[in-house]
A protein has these predicted regions:
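Pair of pore-lining "gating" transmembrane helices in MFS-fold secondary transporters
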Residues: 5-22, 110
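Multi-pass alpha-helical transporter architecture, strongest
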Residues: 174-195
């Protein structure tokens, strides 16, 4: 595999590790921070779950809108936009830890939406530019492990991390944001073809 395969996979590890925690802990974090509840059977927890559904929709609307920005970018800017999106995603995840107002969470999920677009487009674009056409199908198939493996690792280590962080779902999202920022830093080490 070309070196870019491995370089991008390092970035992917941090990103998908973080995203696993977004999916796993968002409802509980929102319930704790905004509704001050931790009991999943409570009305507040259900309201938090419903609000997370609205925020998830906002996240994807943000992704679609930001797609128009990315579409106008030059190939030489791919690494910049990749890192930019990951920084925004990291800030969005970290902000959930600090926000206690449901409406302010819209800001967090707009940023996470920008991240969502970049982490689902830029890695594949950077990889396909780095590989020859002869083996591209095989490499792209193998590249999917850089999405699955980090989520498996995140799930396994959560059995130790969650108690270590005081069984705090907001703290797990804070950790996810830090992982996303580490991914943004790792983009610097990708040897992109258009540079």
């Amino acid at each position: 595999a070309p070196k870019q395969f491995w370089q991008i996979s390092v970035v992917q590890f941090f990103n998908w590790f973080a995203l696993m925690y977004l999916w796993t802990y968002s409802t509980g974090a929102i319930a704790k921070n905004v509704w001050n509840v931790t009991d999943p059977s409570s009305a507040g927890y259900q309201a938090a779950g419903n609000w997370y559904g609205v925020l998830y929709c906002i996240q994807f609307l943000s992704s679609v809108i930001f797609g128009f920005v990315i579409a106008r970018s030059k190939p030489s800017q791919r690494k910049f936009w990749y890192s930019f999106g990951l920084v925004f995603g990291g800030i969005g995840l970290i902000s959930i830890f600090f926000i206690h107002n449901q409406w302010l969470l819209i800001f967090s999920f707009v940023l996470i939406g920008i991240n969502n677009l970049t982490m689902n487009t830029q890695p594949f674009t950077l990889l396909t530019e780095a590989i020859d056409g002869e083996n591209s199908g095989a490499y792209l198939g193998l590249f999917n492990t850089s999405i699955c493996l980090p989520q498996i690792v995140a799930s396994i280590v959560s059995f130790g991390l969650y108690p270590l962080l005081g069984s705090s779902m907001p703290a797990m999202l804070l950790l996810a944001g830090i992982m996303m920022l580490l991914g943004a830093v790792s983009v610097k080490f990708i040897n992109a073809k258009f540079e």
